From Swiss-Prot:
One of its GO terms (cellular component) is cytosol. Its EC number is 3.6.4.13. Residues 627-636, 847-877, 893-904 have a biased composition (Basic and acidic residues). InterPro entries: DBP10_C, DDX54/DBP10_DEAD-box_helicase, DEAD/DEAH_box_helicase_dom, DEAD_box_RNA_helicase, Helicase_ATP-bd, Helicase_C-like, P-loop_NTPase, RNA-helicase_DEAD-box_CS. This is ATP-dependent RNA helicase DBP10. The gene is DBP10. Residues 351-363 have a biased composition (Polar residues). The Q motif is unique to and characteristic of the DEAD box family of RNA helicases and controls ATP binding and hydrolysis.
Amino acid sequence: MSENEFDIAKSLFQDEADSDIDTRPRKRKAPTSLNLDVMADDNGDGDDGGSDDDAAFIAAHQASMNRKASNLKGRTVKKGGGFQAMGLNANLLKAITRKGFSVPTPIQRKTIPLVLDDQDVVGMARTGSGKTAAFVIPMIEKLKSHSTKVGSRGLILSPSRELALQTLKVVKELGRGTDLKCVLLVGGDSLEEQFGYMAGNPDIIIATPGRFLHLKVEMNLDLSSIKYVVFDEADRLFEMGFAAQLTEILHGLPQSRQTLLFSATLPKSLVEFARAGLQEPTLVRLDTESKISPDLQSVFFTVKSAEKEGALLHILHDVIKVPTGETEAGKHAREQAISGKSSKKRKRSEQNNPNPQESPTEHSTIIFVATKHHVDYIASLLRESGFAVSYAYGSLDQTARKIQVSNFRTGISNILVVTDVAARGIDIPILENVINYDFPSQAKIFVHRVGRTARAGRKGWSYSLVRDADAPYLLDLQLFLGRRLVMGRGQQESANFAEDVVVGGMARESIARSCEWVSKLLDEDIDIQNQREVAMKGEKLYIRTRNSASAESAKRAKDVVASDGWTMLHPLFNNEASQMEVEREKMLARIGGYKPQETIFEISGRRGGKAGDDEAIDMMRKIRSTMENKRAKKQDANQPTTDAEVPASALATTLGDDKDNGLGDDMDQDDVADMSMASDSELEVTFSYQSDKSKSKKKSGDKQSSGTFQNPEYFMSYTPAAHSFAEERGYGVHSGSNSNFVEASRDATMDLSRDEANRGFAEPRSIMRWDKRHKKYVSRRNDEDGSKGALLVKGESGAKIAASFRSGRFDAWKKSKRLGRMPRVGETENPGLGSTVPARGQKFRHNKEQAPKAADKYRGDYEKRRKKEQELQKRQAETGMLQFGSKGGTKKVKSEIRSVDDVRKARKLKEKRREKNARPSKKGKAR
C-alpha cells in the first residue's frame, strides 16, 4: 500500500480488527465524533458523491484516532523523535530509561544523530540542558564493548576535577550493562594507582589536561588508537592556562579522530578553536536568546567595599533566611557515628547513593568568591555566625574537596563557599540560591555561576553584590543578556526579576547591624583578622589581573553610579516598613548632597563687617561664576543632540516603557536598540563616544541625522543582520593579553629574514620580570605556560613542558610490580594487567583459599571433610606444594633443578667474577 492510500478495513470490521490486535477485555467508549451520516446519502447508489463520501469518512476517522490516542489515560503513547528513533542498542536504551531520561533535550536531539554520523560537532546550550549525555550516549553506542586490543578509544578532557567526576558518574550510569572500562585521571590522586589504571587497557579516559599530560609523558603513551575526543567546557580548556598541555596532547592524537566541543558559552566564530583540529564541523547553538534559565530570578545589590561582609550576612539571615546551627542531616550523621550500629556495608552504600531526603534543602546556597584566600576568610566568618559551611577551591587536596562537596550534597552543610572552580559542571540537586560575593569579570562566568540553580524546571534565585568599581562589568552583563536595566524603586510595578537586570541598594539599618557585628568579631578574633588581611592582598592582585571591561561600559558606568537609582532601595524590599526607609534614604541623600551658597571667606567677611574683606568676597564670586560657566558648558557638551544618541544607560532603563512615556508616538519601534541582537552599526549609533563628536554633529545639522550614503535597498553589511557584537565579545575565549582573535591578528606581522644580525626597527624587546627567589630577571614566557620559572623540557610537539613530568616514577612502579615490556597499541592485552581496572558492572568477590578443617570422626560430616582433605592433598601433589604446620598452611618448596637459563646465567656470573679477580688459571702458570 502506498503512503497516499488508506486502509478502512479496520473501521468496516471493527470487532474482527480488535480481536486480531488485542484479546484482552477492556472497556472503551465508542468514538462519538465519528460522523457516519455521510454513508446514509439518498443517492448512495450513484457514483457522483462516492469519492467525497470516502474522503469525508477517512478524514473523520483520522481525527477520531488522533483524539483517541491523546485521550488515553494510564497508557503511554510513543512519540517521534525519542531515543528509540536514534538507532541505539537495547542495553543503552535500558540505561537511559533507568537514568530517568524519557525524551531527549534539544541539544541531545540535534547532536546525537550528527555524532553517530561521524561528524565533528561544536555544541552550545544552556547549563543544565543535558550536554554531558549528548556526547556520552553516542560514545557508548560507538564503542559498544571492551576491546582486547591495547589502546584507549575515547578521551574526555575537562577543565576541573569536579566536572571530570560528574562526567564519570554519567558514564557509569549510562554504561551499565556493558563491559567498557573507564578510568578517571585527575590531579591529587596517586600516580601509582593511575599507572595501574592505564596498564589495564581502559576504553574511556576522563581526565584533566595537566594530569593526563603528566601520564602521557611519564608513561610514553601512544594515543594513535584514540577515535573519539571530547573537549568539555571547551572555551575554558582553550584559554591560556591550558595552552601548553593541549598543544602537547593534540600533537599525539591521530588526524582521523572525531572531535567534539561542548560548552554553555561558545562564540559563533570557531577560529579560536582552530588548534582542536576540527574537520568540517557542524555548529549547534541552542538557547542563544535565553542564555540563562527563564526560571531564575536575578537580584543585584549595590554595596560599598567596607559593607560586603555585612551585606552577605544580611542576605543569608533576612533574605534567604538560612537557619543557623547544625542541620538535620548533620545530627543524623553524628548520631550514627556515636551509636555505631550501622554496618560498614550500609555506610558505604549510603555514601555512594545518598538518600534523596538527605539532599540539600531549600536553604542550600553557593557563595562564589574571587580567590582561595576569600574562601578561607568567608568560611571562617560564616562559621562564627553559626552557619554550617563547606568550602572548596582549586589547590585544596582532592580528598578534602570530595568530603566538603559531599557534605553539601547530603545536607550536612547549608552553605558552600567556592571559587570559580565549581562554576562549571557541579550538579547539586535542589540548589535554590547562588550568591556572587565578588562580581565576575566576564559575562560567561556569570552564566556558569547562576547555571548551578534553576535546573530541570525548578525555581532559583541569584544575588550579586555590585560595588562602584564593578559597575562596568554589570553593564557588560546587561548588554550580553540583552535585558532591561531597572534601577531602584522608581519602576517597581514593571520590574521583573526573571527578565530584567534590577539594581538597587539594601536596607541601611540591617546592614549597619551586620557590619557592627563583623567589626566586633574582627577586633576579638585575631585569626579572622589575619585572614581578612590576606584576602585583601589577594583581591588587589585579582583586580590587577582580571579582564578589563569594555570602554563604552566604563563610560556609561560613571553616569549610572552618579544617578539616584544606584543607591535607592531595591524593589525586592517591597513592604510598608520599607517606605520609611525610602524617606530616610532621601533625607540622608539631601543632607549628604547639601552645598552652601557661599564659601567660608564670604561668610566670615560679612560677619566681621570689615571693608578690607570686600576684595576677597568679590574674588570668590568671580571664581564661582567662572566655574559655573565651565560646568554648564560641560553639561551642554555631554547632552545628546538627537534621539539616537541617548546614552545607553537611560535608554536601557526605559526599554519597554515607550508607550507609557509617550515615546511610541515620536519614535519608530525599529529605532529602539534591541540589546539582545545589537549589530555593530546599532552599537555605534546607540553609544555616544566623545564630546567633540557631538560638536561636529551640531555643525553638520540635519544632513547627517536625516540619513547616510547607505541605500537600505542595495546596501550589504559586512556583518550578519542578527550579529550581536556584545554577545560574541562575551562568548570569546579570554586568554590574557590575547583576549580577542581580531586583536591578536592585528599584532601578527610577516616574518622576513633580515640581512643584519641586530634587532630590527620597532621590534619589541623580550619582556622580563624580577624573580625574587633566584635574584635575577627571567622571561615572562614561563608565566604564560604556567611553569613560573621551573625547569622546562621540549615535548614531542616542540612545546615546552615541565621537567617534572619525566621523573622516572613509572619505571620505578614497573620495577616494583616486576613487569617487563608493556604491550603496545594494537597488540592483544595482557589479562594479568587488567585486574586493576574493573569492567562496568563487575563485582569484587573474595577469592582467598583456606585449608579445610581436620576431619573429626565423632561429627556427622566426617566423610565430607575427609573428602575435602584428600582433594587438597591431591592438588598439593600436582602443584608441588607441601603441607606444613598444624593449621594446614601450605608452602611452595623451591626446586633445585636448574633450567637452561639458570645455567647460562650462572656461567656469566662466574665469568664476571673471574675477570674481576684477574688471576691467571693454574694452566697458565704451568706454561
